[in-house]
């Protein structure tokens, strides 16, 4: 099979979910009712759902079977210990707190790390800044809710869709150190390493870059949190693109990766393949005080620390899913599927970010150059794609980035991208071909697509619930 151009999906489909087909008129009415916001569409009105890969894919038979072992004890559940053991074996982290999903971990650790920096280093809350290669939207939101400004320090190649570069998710190391010196190290409560970098197009971060980032963090005694939603995809890219690790297993690369952080926060709904779940973990005893404080907050916000908002069966499923998500054949297929979609779109003249791990990112700014950034070209493209083919995608651009919480002005966005997110083991190559054909129709009418303006704008994470209309 090594010489075949395309390999089929490396799994058998045993259970199916019927979906309905709708008319163009029906879809036009539905998107207007949703306030031109695909997040607000009913799922039954969506033919192909590319909104997110978070908890929307299939699970493996071993994960499903593991649920039957669930211990639903309120405290001290053996299912918790099974999960904690998986974390120790895979990441090498000693302390585990389960959460209902990634943002559950964020709402716990962010205030704890800010308080710790304030007590130990005299952090000035009016001047505090956290750094990342690129903050995920909810991490940014939780930071801002806690009064912390965020700053993304990414390499110049990151958002240039005309450039191919192996590790577009990398930190700008000079920019990171310069930023730390500028605000004062004591005013930096944490650094977040996002692997892969979702907002940059699912782009990986090299191990060499993570090592160098961690060295800078240790120089200034700043804690590093690994945003780990797509840890396995990042490890796969390292194996493929970083020569030093080409003969390492995904498991070995993962273990090495997590040496270069102090904590991990994870939405387990991505690479751990579960429909619901998250993790907050600390590496060793040097962060035991943080673990203790986070456990206390977990009780208030998520649940008792040995279940954290998850039933026992869900913890068992997650304990297995962490392993299943690292399967090399599975990762090779998944990333090849994304590459196939990107190649097909570029063949018809639709410019994309280079293929990442979980999605194709269309450069909406280039497809719709007549729509200015403050009229959200990628959001307008998402609405048109739904009208044409019933495909739901998500904007990653100015609409998502939002406003400066201090000035109220729109934050400048490095690129206006439309994310076509591929749920795991859910759609076939035929679906990819249909998506490509849909873009042919969208491209033909591109000049007539209109920009958007708000009719309702929430102050925080506006892209989830905002409503808009055509200009």
UniProtKB/Swiss-Prot annotation:
Keywords: Acetylation, Cytoplasm, Lyase, Pyridoxal phosphate, Tryptophan catabolism. It is an enzyme of class 4 (lyase). Disruption phenotype: Not essential, cells do not produce indole. The keyword Cytoplasm applies. Its EC number is 4.1.99.1. Its cofactor is pyridoxal 5'-phosphate. The modification N6-(pyridoxal phosphate)lysine is found at residue 270. Its main location: cytoplasm. Changing residue 298 to S: Alters activity. One of its GO terms (molecular function) is tryptophanase activity. InterPro entries: ArAA_b-elim_lyase/Thr_aldolase (IPR001597), Beta-eliminating_lyase (IPR011166), PyrdxlP-dep_Trfase (IPR015424), PyrdxlP-dep_Trfase_major (IPR015421), PyrdxlP-dep_Trfase_small (IPR015422), TNase (IPR013440), Tryptophanase_CS (IPR018176). GO terms for biological process: indole metabolic process; L-tryptophan catabolic process. It catalyses: L-tryptophan + H2O = indole + pyruvate + NH4(+). Pathway: Amino-acid degradation; L-tryptophan degradation via pyruvate pathway; indole and pyruvate from L-tryptophan: step 1/1. Induction: Repressed by cold shock. GO terms for cellular component: cell pole; cytosol; membrane; protein-containing complex. It is found in: Cytoplasm. Homotetramer. Belongs to the beta-eliminating lyase family. This is Tryptophanase. It comes from Escherichia coli (strain K12).
């Amino acid at each position: 099979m090594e010489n075949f151009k395309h390999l089929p999906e490396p799994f058998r489909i045993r259970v199916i979910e019927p979906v309905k087909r709708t008319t163009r008129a029906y879809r036009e009415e539905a998107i207007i009712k949703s306030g031109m916001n695909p997040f607000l569409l009913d799922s039954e009105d969506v033919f192909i759902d590319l909104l997110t890969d978070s908890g929307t894919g299939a699970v493996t038979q071993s994960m499903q079977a593991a649920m039957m072992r669930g211990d639903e004890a309120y405290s001290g559940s053996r299912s918790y210990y099974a999960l904690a053991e998986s974390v120790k074996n895979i990441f090498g982290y000693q302390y585990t707190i389960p959460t209902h999903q990634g943002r559950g971990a964020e709402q716990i650790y962010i205030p704890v790390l800010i308080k710790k920096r304030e007590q130990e280093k005299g952090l000035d809350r009016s001047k505090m800044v956290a750094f990342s290669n690129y903050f995920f939207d909810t991490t940014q939101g939780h930071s801002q809710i806690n009064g912390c400004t965020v700053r993304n320090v990414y390499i110049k190649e990151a958002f240039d869709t005309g450039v191919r570069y192996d590790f577009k998710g990398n930190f700008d190391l000079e920019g990171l150190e310069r930023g730390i010196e500028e605000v004062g190290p004591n005013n930096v409560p944490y650094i977040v390493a996002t692997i892969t970098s979702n907002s940059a197009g699912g782009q990986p971060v090299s191990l060499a870059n993570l090592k160098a980032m961690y060295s800078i963090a240790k120089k200034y005694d700043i804690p590093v949190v690994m945003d780990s939603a797509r840890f396995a995809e990042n490890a796969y890219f390292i194996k493929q693109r970083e020569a030093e690790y080409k003969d390492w297993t995904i498991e070995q690369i993962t273990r090495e990766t997590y040496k270069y952080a102090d904590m991990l926060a994870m939405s387990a709904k991505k690479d751990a393949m579960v429909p619901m779940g998250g993790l907050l973990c600390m590496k060793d005893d040097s962060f035991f005080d943080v673990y203790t404080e986070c456990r206390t907050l977990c009780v208030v916000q998520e649940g008792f620390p040995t279940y954290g908002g998850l039933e026992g069966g869900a913890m068992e499923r997650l304990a297995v899913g962490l392993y299943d998500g690292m399967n090399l054949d599975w990762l090779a297929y998944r990333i090849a599927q994304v590459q196939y979609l990107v190649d097909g779109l570029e063949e018809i003249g639709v410019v994309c970010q280079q293929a990442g791990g979980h999605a194709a990112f269309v450069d909406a700014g280039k497809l719709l150059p007549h729509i200015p950034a403050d009229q959200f070209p990628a959001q307008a493209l998402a609405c048109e794609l739904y009208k044409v083919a019933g495909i739901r995608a998500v904007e990653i651009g100015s609409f998502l980035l939002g406003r400066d919480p201090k000035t109220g002005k729109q934050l400048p966005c490095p690129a206006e991208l439309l994310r076509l997110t591929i749920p795991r083991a859910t759609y076939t190559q035929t679906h990819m071909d249909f998506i490509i054909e849909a873009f042919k129709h969208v491209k033909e009418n591109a000049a007539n697509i209109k920009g958007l303006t708000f009719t309702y704008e929430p102050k925080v994470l506006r892209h989830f619930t905002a409503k808009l209309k055509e200009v």
